[in-house]
Amino acid sequence: MNWNKGGPGTKRGFGFGGFAISAGKKEEPKLPQQSHSAFGATSSSSGFGKSAPPQLPSFYKIGSKRANFDEENAYFEDEEEDSSNVDLPYIPAENSPTRQQFHSKPIDSDSDDDPLEAFMAEVEDQAARDMKRLEEKDKERKNVKGIRDDIEEEDDQETYFRYMAENPTAGVVQEEEEDNLEYDSDGNPIAPTKKIIDPLPPIDHSEIDYPPFEKNFYNEHEEITNLTPQQLIDLRHKLNLRVSGAAPPRPGSSFAHFGFDEQLMHQIRKSEYTQPTPIQCQGVPVALSGRDMIGIAKTGSGKTAAFIWPMLIHIMDQKELEPGDGPIAVIVCPTRELCQQIHAEGKRFGKAYNLRSVAVYGGGSMWEQAKALQEGAEIVVCTPGRLIDHVKKKATNLQRVSYLVFDEADRMFDMGFEYQVRSIASHVRPDRQTLLFSATFRKKIEKLARDILIDPIRVVQGDIGEANEDVTQIVEILHSGPSKWNWLTRRLVEFTSSGSVLLFVTKKANAEELANNLKQEGHNLGLLHGDMDQSERNKVISDFKKKDIPVLVATDVAARGLDIPSIKTVINYDVARDIDTHTHRIGRTGRAGEKGVAYTLLTPKDSNFAGDLVRNLEGANQHVSKELLDLAMQNAWFRKSRFKGGKGKKLNIGGGGLGYRERPGLGSENMDRGNNNVMSNYEAYKPSTGAMGDRLTAMKAAFQSQYKSHFVAASLSNQKAGSSAAGASGWTSAGSLNSVPTNSAQQGHNSPDSPITSATKGIPGFGNIGNISGAPVTYPSAGAQGVNNTASGNNSREGTGGSNGKRERYTENRGSSRHSHGETGNRHSDSPRHGDGGRHGDGYRHPESSSRHTDGHRHGENRHGGSAGRHGENRGANDGRNGESRKEACNRESKMEPKMEPKMEPKVDSNKMDKVDSKTDKTADGFAVPEPPKRKKSRWDS
């Protein structure tokens, strides 16, 4: 709004009547458009001249800036002033009625409620209320009198529970994530992927100053000292103990012989021990003597107490623990459950001396275990990996350890703990005492274990790996998996009526499936395998021990060490992966002399395991069913090993090939005799192309002729001879040394075509390949006859014309393979058998023997002169072809027809009688065998 003084065309005043636009040359800067600019426009300076600026009213500056006449800043000033035209929000006055409503709404009406601000407001309100409540409680406590602080205040347990409720993740570090397979021993054939725990680093013991300690606490009782060596042997035999090692201590037979003090004896009596078990009788004296030990005994035999009692004596002899000291005794075991069980035993007996025990195993709280170790404990029962973790984290150390035990040691070496076990042993002082215990100990594992021992004493109670005879084993052969399920559901209620039932399954997935199926059938049961949380495993075992659940389905994680007396039945629903695991499985019942039953369910595909199971049953004096034996015989390795030394006996399987592989317990003697109709002389056995050229063909022919000759018809007397020589002449298994004929064959001497003749016209050099069963041990008068007969006739059929010198050399070296058989005599490795035949031909035993040995040999041996062999007896000629048969016939006659001996004596030359002792001895098999002549020693004498 401009003030105009008036002039030509312009009214005086503010110019409400019209507007004027200045038309002068010099334009005045435009004023910012404001609300009052509509009242008038700037006019030209018509009255004051061109250069005079217009005069503004005095109230012009109200609500506006001073005009900026600087052209350079005009542009920016316009923008700044344009932004000031924004309308300001409405702000009600203090006493306005709308102010309260204004405050109840957020300033920014477009945004919603912020949840974080609402939550924080609630937290603040809650905190305020809690503080107010606490203040009120404090006031009440001050006002009320007669309050006992020891009751009202929180004790340690309440404080701990409150703290854990407020801090559920307390003590859990990031490294302690769930790793359920760390110590899993469920027995899967494929080793599960485990958390790799690096072993402890090597340590230089020479830099550490270890204090000395005493290991030997055994004072032998006078009753034991007074035992004679024979009585000591009888005592160990009675306890079924086998002890090896340097100077083992004598076993005790009662607790009085151990020399325990009254405190420990009170605890032992409280545990209802009446007398020590066999492994304790020998193991406790060995451990008290400070010796390293390998203890092997069947399951449930008291191995745990055998190393815990000496451990307490060992600990009590040393000074008390100081702050920062590690344990004195460390017991290492493979599974968590076994660790907890040994820990419970250690606490029970350690109460006698107020000794502390700590269980350290995977799955437990690392923080709690570390705290218990730092507080100090004389005994630590642990699994290998967790102990290594604690040593690495400085929760404990092994400097004071002087008593180290590995329970179920073979399992730890077998499960892949070997490096960890060795690193633990290497971190303990070198002069420690180390004990290894297990129920099974294979030779390979024992060699590995001996590296950490020094001059150990090996104590074996019973047989290594033998099953407990208190457990009755029953094997069920079923057709398939569904058959096993039907069998189980049909019998399970019956089993639970007699006691708790433990079901073993090989794989974890199968265990869960079986448990779920049984639950659907309405059975109350528990499940235990390596993938479960440790708390769940503990709860299941606790409920099973308390008989809250009658059935437990488990993998092999429960196969070792669990001592639950209520288990009366063990069922191997799946077979174990090896016989050692099977032994431990069935050992969960029949504990401490109690009786139990173990069922093993087999299917046709389990033939490999059936062979091991047969031997396990036989070793425990259990019944082996025919079905189980037939299943085991389907396995080739068992069938072959069964032939060599087993109890089985197979039917005669004839036909081509090397028959001895198919005949268990039969036919070592008859293998030495082929049929001379097939091969008439040694020329047929020349190896033409190689070491096994025609030799293999000859062997096959010999065996074929052997079977053909079994059933040749003949007269009554000849049948006797034939049956005795060819059918029942002491067949033994290939590789054995017990080749003793069982029947007389003399009746067939006078029959040229008798079965004994056809059966014995064989080739003595090819019987029982690979063994020495055909060679006699003590046979008489070969030397005597050889000496006397070398001077007689040169009527050998093959006409090799062996000289007397050759004959004498053969006689003296009949035990070697030097005798002359014409062209082929030196080709035959079994030539000692021809010499043995001569040894067996005692003149005083046979009326025809002197003539039989004159020209009986068609092999060109030339050791017997004359042709009386052919005229006297065809049997003698045949025996000449096969010295082994002649030997056998003489041996049979010595047993079956002793009445012939006096008749034979007159026909024996006086020179022979000078060199032959007519006395005969009985062998261990009950067969009469004459004493050997006085002659030079041969290799058979040894």
Curated annotation (Swiss-Prot):
Modification sites for N6-acetyllysine: K5
Name of the top EC class for this enzyme: hydrolase
Residue ranges with Low complexity bias: 35-52
Ubl conjugation as UniProt keyword: yes
Keyword Phosphoprotein: yes
Residues modified to Phosphoserine: S58, S96, S104, S109, S111, S185, S754
Coiled coil (UniProt feature): 116-157
Function of the protein: ATP-dependent RNA helicase that binds to partially double-stranded RNAs (dsRNAs) in order to unwind RNA secondary structures. Unwinding is promoted in the presence of single-strand binding proteins. Also mediates RNA duplex formation thereby displacing the single-strand RNA binding protein. ATP and ADP modulate its activity: ATP binding and hydrolysis by DDX42 triggers RNA strand separation, whereas the ADP-bound form of the protein triggers annealing of complementary RNA strands.
Sequence similarity: Belongs to the DEAD box helicase family. DDX42 subfamily.
Quaternary structure note: Transient component of the SF3B subcomplex of the 17S U2 SnRNP complex. Interacts (via the C-terminus) with TP53BP2; the interaction is not inhibitied by TP53BP2 ubiquitination and is independent of p53/TP53.
Protein's name according to its UniProt entry: ATP-dependent RNA helicase DDX42
Origin species: Pongo abelii (Sumatran orangutan)
